[in-house]
Amino acid sequence: MFYFHCPPQLEGTAPFGNHSTGDFDDGFLRRKQRRNRTTFALQQLEALEAVFAQTHYPDVFTREELAMKINLTEARVQVWFQNRRAKWRKTERGASDQEPGAKEPMAEVTPPPVRNINSPPPGDQARGKKEALEAQQSLGRTVGPAGPFFPSCLPGTLLNTATYAQALSHVASLKGGPLCSCCVPDPMGLSFLPTYGCQSNRTASVAALRMKAREHSEAVLQSANLLPSTSSSPGPASKQVPPEGSQDKPSPTKEQSEGEKSV
């Protein structure tokens, strides 16, 4: 079994090659060197800004001349111009993003309308408008040469009050004259349709019929009371009716009556 071991170092020789420890220390310090933030004076900033206003990318000769003038190194001046260009690009980008919003006028914010407590909700209003529009369209389709057709007294389940009133006003405008709120002439003669409403007209007709019946009954009673008085008054002589037995026997002739006398 073999063992490998390092031979003893000779005195006066450098370990691990010909490099000295001083070389490693200088390289380590060079890598670990930290940058210090430069604090510019007011006069230095004014001179740098004046050159930046003329050109954003000064050449090396301009940077060296400026560095000698403000007592800085050319490297510091170059770094300042790099940072200043980055700041300028950021400012321009932010200004371009805000330009569309600045050009467009802000829309006026209008408060929502105050809804009355007793008014129907918006959903019911929209539904009522839709039903009114459908009713008007159906009425427009049923208009013929004889005039607008509208079923007499539509049931209340089909249209609500607002829709029914709008439909009636539309029919009145098409006809060109006033129209009853519940009874519309039916030119198609659809009398078999069930009638709804018209309570006032129906009540009036029933009352008129009852009054006519009462007048007729009174006239009949008056005529019945007048019959006995008219029968007692003198009149033409009534014709005598022969008895029942004489109707079967023929009347005797003249010769037969003379023969009976001679006998």
UniProtKB/Swiss-Prot annotation:
Composition bias type Basic and acidic residues, residue spans: 89-106, 251-263
InterPro entries: HD, Homeobox_CS, Homeodomain-like_sf, OAR_dom, Paired_Homeobox_TFs
Ranges where the record places region Disordered: 88-135, 219-263
Location(s) in or outside the cell: Nucleus
Motif OAR positions after renumbering to this chain: 204-217
Domain of life where this protein originates: Eukaryota
Subunit structure: Interacts with RGMB.
Family, as annotated: Belongs to the paired homeobox family.
Primary role: Transcription factor required for the formation of correct projections from nociceptive sensory neurons to the dorsal horn of the spinal cord and normal perception of pain.
Protein name: Dorsal root ganglia homeobox protein
Gene name linked to the record: Drgx
